[in-house]
Amino acid sequence: TKPLDRELIARFHLRAHAVDINGNRVENPIDIVINVIDMNDNRPEFLHQVWNGSVPEGSKPGTYVMTVTAIDADDPNALNGMLRYRILSQAPSTPSPNMFTINNETGDIITVAAGLDREKVQQYTLIIQATDMEGNPTYGLSNTATAVITVTDVNDNPPEFTAMTFYGEVPENRVEVIVANLTVTDKDQPHTPAWNAVYRISGGDPTGRFAIHTDPNSNDGLVTVVKPIDFETNRMFV
């Protein structure tokens, strides 16, 4: 008398018996079991509309990135509830329009091409589609979600001095003053261990009159005087 919804009630158990015109039972009761046949009336639904993952730059093809998951209220043991995944688009499309692939049954996303470089592309956006009926493009119902993949930094760029020679000066007998500011550039992500420069004086100061430390904000090398310098004895240090 009313429409049936398998997702609400998948099976009905009825008990029936026959009676005569006077209402007396003429047969023993019998059990009737009615199974509601599933119809493909539910689209796949992703657990999240936006999925976030990460992968180190320079990762080899076949590196696992993340897993996306969708569910379907239809019968999971029938075609109506059997899902398949695929990537609809990738942005940006460099260095290849197919940097990633997805396992169509599990939703696992892995790298499929080399060339991930954080200094060139820091983030990829994939549109993922889930389709029931085992991915049938004609009869299956579909839904989409977004996968955002961040390319994380690795230490693949050395610091480079901005000049071959730096100059400084200091009055004699002064200590704890900055005499030179050495500047470097590093293409790795700022304020990470891959970016932080460590300086040392490798020659030209046998008596240890100078020290150098890193400015944590600018990454510059700050040369300071730690022992008094006599102008009449030493007029220049290289």
Swiss-Prot record:
Record's subcellular location: Cell membrane; Cell membrane, Sarcolemma; Cell junction; Cell surface
Listed InterPro entries: Cadherin, Cadherin-like_dom, Cadherin-like_sf, Cadherin_CS
Binding-site list for Ca(2+) 2: E7, D38, M39, D41, D74
Keyword Repeat among UniProt keywords: yes
Keywords: Calcium, Cell adhesion, Cell junction, Cell membrane, Glycoprotein, Membrane, Metal-binding, Phosphoprotein, Repeat, Transmembrane
A Gene Ontology BP annotation from the UniProt entry: calcium-dependent cell-cell adhesion via plasma membrane cell adhesion molecules
Binding site for Ca(2+) 3: N40, N42, D72, N80, D132
Annotated ranges, domain Cadherin: 1-46, 47-161, 162-238
Glycosylation sites: N52, N104, N181
CDD domains: Cadherin_repeat
Modification after translation, per record: Cleaved by MMP24. Ectodomain cleavage leads to the generation of a soluble 90 kDa N-terminal soluble fragment and a 45 kDa membrane-bound C-terminal fragment 1 (CTF1), which is further cleaved by gamma-secretase into a 35 kDa. Cleavage in neural stem cells by MMP24 affects CDH2-mediated anchorage of neural stem cells to ependymocytes in the adult subependymal zone, leading to modulate neural stem cell quiescence.
Designated name of the protein: Cadherin-2
Organism: Cricetulus griseus (Chinese hamster)
Originating gene: CDH2
